[in-house]
């Protein structure tokens, strides 16, 4: 099968970046970049660019980790979206580049450690309590949502810089409700 011109451009990009001589974490965010690092392309990157050691997977497709592990077993997978942490942890992950731990660091790290140690029975209800909130990390308003979550718990998130505008009042209220729900879970468990 022939590779697409875009795939060749992606390979050329990583080869150029690799000239710096340090390990590279590829970032798959097809929503914002309009370039999808498919498992087949990740396999090709793994074969042709040894400096790429990991991928931050933000496609939202939880099936991909299994394909990446099969096609590019040397590439470590890092969770790139908060709302797929538990699903990807079932396949074994190497890390989590996350948003909402800025607002809820202790709770998020507890969840991460339970999930990565395979303690899914304890992790599942915790994840359920956080999931609606975590889903904001996969929306275009994620920066505003995380900052608002930080403000909610007394960690200064502050206003966003332009071009990001404050969230509409109904979305702010929703985030406050979701923060309250998550905090109540941790307080009452």
Language-model-detected regions and their locations in the chain:
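Short, small-residue-biased leader/transition segments that mark boundaries at the very start
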Residues: 1-3
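Charged helix-capping and loop-helix junction motifs
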Residues: 7-15, 38-42
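Alpha-helix-loop-beta-strand connector modules within alpha/beta enzyme cores
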Residues: 11-26
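Catalytic alpha/beta core domains of metabolic enzymes, predominantly
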Residues: 20-22, 32-140
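Conserved C-terminal portion of the radical SAM core fold
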Residues: 29
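Conserved short secondary-structure transition element at the edge of the structured enzyme core
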Residues: 89-92, 131-164
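Flexible C-terminal active-site loop/helix
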Residues: 155-189
